[in-house]
Regions:
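A residue-level signal for conserved active-site and pocket-lining positions in enzyme catalytic cores
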Residues: 19, 125, 153
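Hydrophobic residues positioned within well-ordered beta-strands of beta-sheet architectures
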Residues: 1, 16, 87-89, 123, ...
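Asparagine-centered strand-capping/turn motif at beta-strand->loop junctions
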Residues: 2-8, 114
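Glycine-rich active-site loops that engage anionic ligands at enzyme catalytic sites
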Residues: 93-132
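Short, acidic/polar linear motifs in exposed loop/turn regions
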Residues: 7-10, 166
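Active-site/ligand-binding surface loops and adjacent short beta/alpha elements
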Residues: 11-13, 21-105
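Short, structured beta-strand/loop micro-motifs enriched in basic residues and often containing a Trp
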Residues: 135-143
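Short Pro-Gly-centered flexible turn/kink motifs
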Residues: 2, 148-165
Length: 166
């Protein structure tokens, strides 16, 4: 659960996000399950700058609401899902065992990643309110894509849930 309180007299600009990682036997073949979705718009990361390549989104096609992680899935580092597209995503081992579900009704963005070309034994499912800059952005924080704002004297509260199944 997160609570943001603005005790100042000016608007507060902020980003917050969770960074849960889940152990898997092997990244290869894991399933990402997006219930009720047939496809998603996905923004990759420009690795040299560490910024979002929002001008070149990819379409992530799903088969029966499922995307199977392959050898090159995380070549662009993080799959970023903007505009509140993802409110719930499940991660399942390739053999169908061990399923974990992230439920994040207020997340404006969700990042899914594993270290580039490492076949590391984990995948991160991250709910975000705000995210990294778009490639080439040089403006002020208040103008940053996805930045959250909170008026003086106000507070904001939200939470996400992780469900672990066998």
């Amino acid at each position: 659960e997160w609570t943001v309180k603005n005790t100042d007299t000016k608007t507060l600009y902020y980003s917050i996000g969770g960074h849960p990682a889940f152990n898997v036997d092997s990244v290869m073949g894991c399933r990402l399950i997006f219930e009720g979705m047939d496809k998603l718009s996905c923004t990759g990361i420009d690795l040299p700058t560490g910024t979002a390549d929002a001008e070149h989104p990819a379409t992530l096609a799903l088969t029966d609401h499922v995307y199977t992680v392959g050898e090159h899935t995380f070549d662009a580092d993080t799959m970023v899902f903007d505009e509140g597209q993802v409110k719930k995503v499940s991660l399942q081992e390739a053999d169908g065992t061990k399923r974990v579900t992230l439920i994040c009704p207020d997340a404006k963005h969700v990042g899914i990643w594993s270290p580039v070309q490492k076949n590391a034994p984990f995948i991160c499912l991250e709910p975000w309110l705000g995210r990294c800059d778009n490639k080439g952005f040089t403006g002020e924080l208040k103008d940053k894509y996805g930045e959250q704002s909170l008026e003086a004297g106000k507070s904001f509260r939200t939470a996400y849930e992780i469900v672990v199944e066998k």
